[in-house]
Amino acid sequence: MGRTRADYERILQNPKTRALLNTISYAEGTSGPDGYRTMFGGGTFDDLSRHPDRVIDGGRYRSAAAGRYQFMPDTYQEVSNQLGLSDFQPRSQDVAALALIDRRGALDPFLGGEKFGKVMNLLAPEWASLPTNEGASYYGQPVKGIGDLYQYYQSQSGALDAPTGTVAAPTSGVTQVFIKGDDEPKKEKASSLLDVFKEQLMQQFLPNILPF
């Protein structure tokens, strides 16, 4: 990794980067309010001064993974030493996750507009819940589907980019619909229309975007 902590802090300001981190958290099952305090198996811990480094027996699997991005203790320690991270606070976890994305060779392709599925494939060896090009976990564990992850990523990046009070559907091949806070249209009807348009978009564009 040639980047510094300051570099990753800067990259974190990119809404698309935050959407990617949110997607990884969603795949790992830590997207809730306690994500940064979540241990393997769903339990939580309070001390964010360091990685808890506690092995949890989940029955089929045993793991010491913890935090929003389910860091293994040795992995987090290694990245912390390289970047000068002195705690396990949310910001430190975000920076460390970006460093792992970078280490897997996925950060530059992602920032450069690489296909979402290819980015997931690059990250699959780091996060078992992310799918390879074959749609399976790199480690044979439960995995999120690529379509599910892409929809979640789009929902996160769209929410971050859209102006407050306005959600616009893309106009290529579908009718454009706006929901504006000023006009207060019939929300149920608009929501139904947007669901239809979303399905049309997924069918029209997803095969060209994601390598299934």
Give residue spans per PLM region.
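Cell-wall polysaccharide-cleaving catalytic domain and substrate-binding groove, primarily
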Residues: M1-S86, V95-K180, E184-K189, L193-F212
